[in-house]
Structures are given as C-alpha cells and as structure tokens.
Amino acid sequence: MNILNVEKVSKTYGEKELFNNISLGINSGDKIGLIGVNGTGKSTLLKIIAGVEEPDEGQVVKGKGIELAYLAQTPLYYENENVLEYVMRGKHADSQPKAKEILNKLGITNHGAMMNILSGGQKKRAALARTLVEPARLLILDEPTNHLDNDMVLWLEQFIKNFKGELIMVTHDRYFLDNVTNRIVELDKASLYSYDTNYSGFLELKTQREEMERATEAKRQNILRKELAWIRRGCQARSTKQQARIDRFEDMKEASKQARARFDKQLMDM
C-alpha cells in the first residue's frame, strides 16, 4: 500500500540546485534512511515531505487519512510553556503517562522545567518525545540520535523496530541506520536513488552502480576517440548522415564533460 508520493519535485536555493524532478513513493512497511553528503538537501526534502516547506515544482500527495509526525533539527516552542506542556500540546490527555515515560527514557526527568532554559540537546530530546508520544502513521525524523547517549539510542532503536507505521529519517549514525532501516534512499547530484536494503546492503549496491557508470563512461570515451579520429581525417559535412554523425559527436563530447565534472565533484566531496 502506498501512503505518500513525492511527485516530480524540484528545489533550488539561489544558484544551488538541490534536487531536480525527483519522485519517491513511501509504501506500507517502509523504514527509509535518507542519505547523501552534506549540503545535498536532505533536511530540505524532509521539510517538503512534512509540508513545512514548499517545493519550487512538483507536489507531495498523502494517502487519505495519513498523519505525519515531524522532528525538525531545531524545535519550535512557546516561551511560556514547560516541558510537559510542550510535549502534550495538541495531544490527548490520556497520553500524559506515556509522555512522562518517554521523557524519562530520554533523560528529562524535570517535566516542569521551562523550555526556554533547557540546553539545545535537551530541547531536541523534548522534541523527539513530542514526536513519539502519539506516533502518526509516518514518522519524519531529522537527526533523531543527536544529543542521545548510548542507552537512549538503544531505546530509540527498539522503539522504531516495534513501531507499526512507516519512517523516513536522516541520521549520521551509520550503526543505528543499519539496524532500523529496510530501505535506503540516496540524494546524489540532485537525483534520488532507491535501494531496497539496509545501509550495509546499500554500500554494496552503490559500488555496483558506480562500476556500471564507469563502464558506460569508458565505452562512451572509446566511441568518442573513434569519432574524433574520423573528424580529424578531414570529414566534410557533405551529407545529412555525415552532419548527423558530427552532431552526435558534439553531444557525446558535452556529455563526457558533464560526467567528468560530476566525478571531480565526487572526489572533492570525499
């Protein structure tokens, strides 16, 4: 069952293109890890999926009755509310015992402390508790393990494994990612690549994809050398077929330049 679709979405900040005409379907049972080098737009994509930011083009379509719960990198709160009030805002009153339990698991035992005096890490943990106290069908988590100690990470790992809904998250914790996901989506060079596996399996499949891309580029370079030799022999565009061959050569040369530029950028990112 499909619960949410990202349809032909594009987003640009200034001159930087984050993604171009990308699509993604989130299906029943998916626990997705969204990965990519810093600056590729992972957090922006989560915001668009959560509905807190608009794409330049395209749309996000939710299934009927599908509710989302979003953990942002920077929590928003009212200055005059305490931790428990913040976590329970908009929730059912009978969820309060569970809210207190989750806060305790996340190391926040003073539930009456004002949000505006908490440290950045405590605020993020309070926001995580707010996201989990009444889990929606789809959890959207941006760096959920930041500011968690090892016991808290293990608790969250078990929580997500037991969670019956769907998940898409960004995290730099590769061990956590490997343990809780069953699908990896990579944001790379403004495009999305989906792998039906956890992080360890993704590394193997990505290596295979990159080897295929290198083989394709090597084949293109070989053809390019042959065409260049043909042109240097003094070909004149005396016929439509010859002109078409020259045009194809120019197209291949431009494609080769673009492929090389992408490869050089990958080396810089590494």
Ranges and model annotations:
Residues I3, S10, Q208-M270:
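Flexible nucleotide-interacting loop at or near the entrance of a catalytic core
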Residues M1-E217:
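ABC ATP-binding cassette signature C-motif
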